[in-house]
Amino acid sequence: MNEDVVLVSGLWMPAALMAPLGARLARAGFRPRRFAYSGRRSLAGATERLAAFTRGGAPHFVGHSLGGVLIFDMLSRHPGAGAGRIVLIGAPVTGCLAGRRLGAWAVGRWMLGTSAPRWQPCAARWERPEPLGVIAGTRTLGLGRMLGVLPGENDGVVQVEETTVQGMAERVLLRQGHSMLPLSGRVAALVERFLRAGRFA
């Protein structure tokens, strides 16, 4: 098979955090490639660098948190970019209440960097032909708990409803906290299955 898979980690999280998932995918015959970016710098610039990083190919994409948002934004803005199958893990593509609460403080705005505007509410529609799968956590463990109770099901940082993409192929909910999602063996198995078949079940 030897298909490329681009892995993109979340805000404040090193690209190495995706290493266990990458190792699982490598054992399954994929070629993982980690894309690194700085959340303190321009997100638009990171989106363009991701497009350049994958230009000329049609890799699969897997992103956690802000990494998933970057993937979604890049592929939405570059309809001609090649892609295989896409999995977003705990990615708040329609905005993030916890992020907005954090941004209400000066230190929070500094921590969020240029990502702050992306956490405002917005719609997310998938209009490309490639299948897009979403994995969301429902175990309320994470930074968001320090910023007040999050309504509805959430992973401690991202609400399940914030991961909603109109046109997504499928979404699964797992009893995991936000930071543990990319390290979960269950998540890795689901990602592998979706990259092979375009579905989780």
What residue ranges belong to the model's regions?
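Serine-dependent carboxylesterase/thioesterase catalytic core
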Residues: 5-11, 16, 20, 24-26, ...
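A short, charged/proline- and glycine-enriched loop
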Residues: 1-3
